[in-house]
C-alpha cells in the first residue's frame, strides 16, 4: 500500500527503521520545544494537495484538500493533545459529541430519534433547526481563539505553545503542474493537525456560552434539565417546543457566531434536503454494458452505506426480531 510522506518529504517508515535512535532524537526535540515554546519552522509547514470533487473544476469550492505535515511533528502534537484532553473533559458539556472518545454522530442521531419518539408518545410538538457553518474550520480567528482558550482556563504555557505554532505557519499547494511558493496562513485551524478538532470544539463552545443557550430556560425538559441543543463539532441542532422560541435560539446563535467570524451556511442546509443517494440510477442499472456483479457492487458501495447509516438506533418490534 502506498503511503504519503510528510510535508518535509520524510516517510514514516524511516522512523520505524531507526527505532531507538529516532526516539531519543524526537524526545530531545520535544523537550526543547516544551521548554522554549519555540517550534522548528519545518514543523509549521504543510503541503496542500487539491483533489477535485463533482462540478466545475475551475471553481475552488469544488475541491477537497489532502494536507501533508511532518511526521515527526505529530509526536509533539500527540503530547499536546493529551494535555488538552483534561480541559476538554472539564469544559465541554455532554451535548457536544464531536471528536470525543466513545462518542459519535450515531449517538446524536439516537438522541434525536428518542426525543421524537417521546414527543409522539406524549403528543407534544418539537421543533428542530439543523445548523451548519460555511467553512467553519477555515474561518477561526486566531486572536479570538487564544482569548477563548484563556477564558476556558487552559494554562498560559500551553496557550503560548499553540500561539507560537500558528505564528508564521506556511503552506504550499502541490498539483500535477508543479508547486507554488510558500505563503502564510492567517486564519483557520491547521488542516491535517490532530489538535484542530479539539481547538475548534473550544471555539464552538464559546459561541454557545456567549449566546446564552446554557442559561436560558428554553428547550426540552429531560430528566429535570433543559436541553436545547445537540452538537457534533460545528454541526448544531437546536430544539424547542415552540416555533417562536426556536427562532429566538437561532438568532442568538447567529449573532454569537458572527461575533467570532462564523456564518451560517444556508445554502448547504437547502442542499442537504434535496440530496439523493444516486442522481440518475437508471443509466447505470438499465445499461446492458454493465455486468450484474458490477451493478451489485455499486449498490453495496453507493446505496447500502446511505440507507443503513445509523441503523443501530432503529426500533425493531419483538415480532420482527
Per-range role (PLM):
Residues 177, 264-275:
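Short, conserved micro-motifs composed of acidic
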Residues 274-321:
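Non-catalytic, peripheral interaction segments enriched in hydrophobic/basic residues
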Residues 135-152, 230-260, 275, 315-318:
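Catalytic palm subdomain of template-directed nucleic-acid polymerases
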Residues 80-96, 199-233, 237:
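Active-site palm subdomain of RNA-directed nucleic acid polymerases
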Residues 116-119, 130, 134-137, 233-236, ...:
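Residues that mediate protein self-association or partner binding, especially
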Residues 1-203:
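Conserved pre-catalytic core of RNA-dependent polymerases
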